[in-house]
């Protein structure tokens, strides 16, 4: 790579620096250009020479001073930077150091000395170091800090002078009483609180205010509704009282002509009976032309009498009742909405009564359902117990039948048992429970009889026992068949 870099610019420079018509001077210029290129190549080689070294894999607890002690004696260098461990790179928490040497020979000696050198930490763990060229060969420049022009000029600053003046006045105020100071502090706090207004706080305050206004409106409406209801009830009651009074007055007025009528009632009754009898006779008879005209005249006269009576009653009522003034009539006209409010109140009462009736019906229906469920449960339990009893009866019958069958089987085995009993009587051994047959009947005093009686009598007794068993089995069968 170095040879290519050396040859390429030479060829270019030669072609460019050969002007036409200048032969002798061209040789001198070519020699100067070759010298300049050699200097540039040397500078490039110096720049390309690696001088910055990094020491990696150092213990995480190692400090800069401890590392410098280990590296003594240090060769000539112009840059030394130490970086402690980084906890974010766990578990690879190692320290490292960068050194820029002035001489290339010192780099080789340093590498031979510290590459693979084992460092120990506080806990005695070993950390073999690695020495190699740094990937970034440039060194950080040390910035020369310029002196600030404002250093030592605070006494001349006008703001500082104002501060000193205000500070002196504050000291004078401190001599005042604590009450005045508290008042001043409270006033300042109030001003600060009043000034602290953000859009969020204003929004929340407005929201709270709107809620309070809505609540007040609701309360006011409820109060008005209650007042209106009370007024409607009061008016309705007053109207009812007034109507009752009017009805009572009318009844009193009607009673006066009724008393007068009571005196003439017997005559009227006689006339009525006579009229009924005459009417019946007339109905039986065929009406003639003259009679029909007379009947029409009588009916017309009756109608006129009835109309006259109704007019007299109306006139009597109007005379008896006091005349109302125009103001009262005007007051009565706007009473229509009051009547409507009374009707609404009555309708509400009717709806409430209907709701109560519906609730009572639902409760009765639920009670009936519960009673039906309880009855069904009782029926189910009764049926269950009845079925259980039937099953028990069937089981008892089956057991009785099984006993009868087993008795028959014992009769067939009886002959074989006779021979065994004879041998047992001869031996006169005690019979144990395990040696007894499964279906042998209990015979009290059988052992004493066997000892006293000869073997022939024992056989007879065995035959009689077998006959008894047969008879008992037959009787059981008969009972089972009858059942």
Curated annotation (Swiss-Prot):
Q: Do the record's keywords include Transmembrane helix?
A: no
Report residue spans for region: Binds to UPF2. 52-57
Q: Which UniProt keywords apply?
A: Cytoplasm, Disease variant, Intellectual disability, Methylation, mRNA transport, Nonsense-mediated mRNA decay, Nucleus, Phosphoprotein, RNA-binding, Transport
**Modified residue annotations for Phosphoserine:** 310
Positions of the UniProt region annotated as Disordered: 1-51, 206-483
Xref: InterPro entries: Nucleotide-bd_a/b_plait_sf (IPR012677), RBD_domain_sf (IPR035979), Upf3 (IPR039722), UPF3_dom (IPR005120), UPF3B_RRM-like (IPR034979)
> What GO cellular component term, any one, is given?
centriolar satellite
Give the consequence of mutating residue 449 to E: Abolishes NMD
Q: Does the keyword Transport apply?
A: yes
Query: Do you know which CDD domains this protein is assigned to?
Result: RRM_like_Smg4_UPF3B
Q: Residue spans with biased composition (Basic and acidic residues)?
A: 1-14, 34-50, 209-268, 285-314, 323-409, 417-437, 457-483
**Outcome, altering residue 56 to E:** Does not abolish interaction with UPF2
**Omega-N-methylarginine: residues carrying this PTM:** 447
Which consequence is recorded for altering residue 442 to A?
Answer: Impairs association with EJC
Assembly notes? Found in a post-splicing messenger ribonucleoprotein (mRNP) complex. Core component of the mRNA splicing-dependent exon junction complex (EJC); the core complex contains CASC3, EIF4A3, MAGOH or MAGOHB, and RBM8A. The EJC core components EIF4A3 and the MAGOH-RBM8A dimer form a composite binding site for UPF3B which overlaps with the EJC binding site for WIBG. Interacts with EST1A, UPF2 and RBM8A. Interacts with CPSF6. Interacts with DHX34; the interaction is RNA-independent.
**Purpose of the protein:** Involved in nonsense-mediated decay (NMD) of mRNAs containing premature stop codons by associating with the nuclear exon junction complex (EJC) and serving as link between the EJC core and NMD machinery. Recruits UPF2 at the cytoplasmic side of the nuclear envelope and the subsequent formation of an UPF1-UPF2-UPF3 surveillance complex (including UPF1 bound to release factors at the stalled ribosome) is believed to activate NMD. In cooperation with UPF2 stimulates both ATPase and RNA helicase activities of UPF1. Binds spliced mRNA upstream of exon-exon junctions.
Linked pathology is: Intellectual developmental disorder, X-linked, syndromic 14: A disorder characterized by significantly below average general intellectual functioning associated with impairments in adaptive behavior and manifested during the developmental period. MRXS14 patients manifest intellectual disability associated with other variable signs such as autistic features, slender build, poor musculature, long, thin face, high-arched palate, high nasal bridge, and pectus deformities.
Task: Please identify the protein, giving its name as recorded.
Answer: Regulator of nonsense transcripts 3B
Q: Which organism is it from?
A: Homo sapiens (Human)
């Amino acid at each position: 790579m170095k040879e290519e870099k050396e040859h390429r610019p030479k060829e270019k420079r030669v072609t460019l620096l050969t002007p036409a018509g200048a032969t002798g001077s061209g040789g001198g210029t070519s020699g100067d250009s070759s010298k300049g290129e050699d200097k540039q190549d040397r500078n490039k080689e110096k720049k390309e020479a690696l001088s910055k070294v990094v020491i990696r894999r150092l213990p995480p607890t190692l400090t800069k001073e401890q590392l410098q002690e280990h590296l003594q004696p240090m060769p000539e260098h112009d840059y030394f930077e130490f970086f402690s461990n980084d906890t974010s790179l766990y578990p690879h928490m190692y320290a490292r150091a960068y050194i820029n040497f002035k001489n290339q020979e010192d780099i080789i000696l340093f590498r031979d000395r510290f590459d693979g050198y084992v460092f120990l930490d506080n806990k005695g763990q070993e950390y073999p170091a690695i020495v190699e060229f740094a990937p970034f060969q440039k060194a950080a420049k040390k910035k020369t800090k310029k002196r600030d022009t404002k250093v030592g000029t605070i006494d001349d600053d006008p703001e500082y002078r104002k501060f000193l003046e205000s500070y002196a006045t504050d000291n004078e105020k401190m001599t005042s009483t604590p009450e005045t100071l508290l008042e001043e502090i409270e006033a300042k706090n109030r001003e600060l609180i009043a000034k602290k207004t953000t859009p969020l706080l204003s929004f929340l305050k407005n929201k709270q205010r709107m809620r309070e206004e809505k609540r007040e409106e609701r309360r006011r409406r409820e109060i008005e509704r209650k007042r209106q209801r009370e007024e409607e009830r009061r008016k309705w009651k007053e109207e009812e009282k007034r109507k009752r009074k009017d009805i009572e007055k009318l009844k009193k007025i009607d009673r006066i002509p009724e008393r007068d009528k009571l005196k003439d009632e017997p005559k009227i009754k006689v006339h009525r009976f006579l009229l009924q009898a005459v009417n019946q006779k007339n109905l039986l008879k065929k009406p003639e032309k003259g009679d029909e005209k007379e009947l029409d005249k009588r009916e017309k006269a009756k109608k006129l009498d009835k109309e006259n009576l109704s007019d007299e009653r109306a006139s009597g009522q109007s005379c008896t009742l006091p005349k109302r003034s125009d103001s009262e009539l005007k007051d009565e006209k706007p009473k229509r909405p009051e009547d409507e409010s009374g009707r609404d109140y009555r309708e509400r009462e009717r709806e409430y009564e209907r709701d109560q009736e519906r609730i009572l019906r639902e409760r009765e229906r639920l009670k009936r359902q519960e009673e039906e469920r309880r009855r069904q449960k009782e029926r189910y339990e009764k049926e269950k117990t009845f079925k259980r009893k039937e099953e028990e009866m069937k089981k008892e019958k089956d057991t009785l039948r099984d006993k009868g069958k087993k008795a028959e089987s014992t009769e067939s085995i009886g002959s074989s048992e006779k021979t065994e009993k004879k041998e047992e009587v001869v031996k006169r051994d005690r019979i144990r429970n395990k040696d007894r047959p499964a279906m042998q009947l209990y015979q009290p005093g059988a052992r004493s009889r066997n000892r006293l009686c000869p073997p022939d009598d024992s056989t007879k007794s065995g035959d009689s026992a077998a006959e008894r068993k047969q008879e008992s089995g037959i009787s059981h069968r008969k009972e089972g068949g009858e059942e």
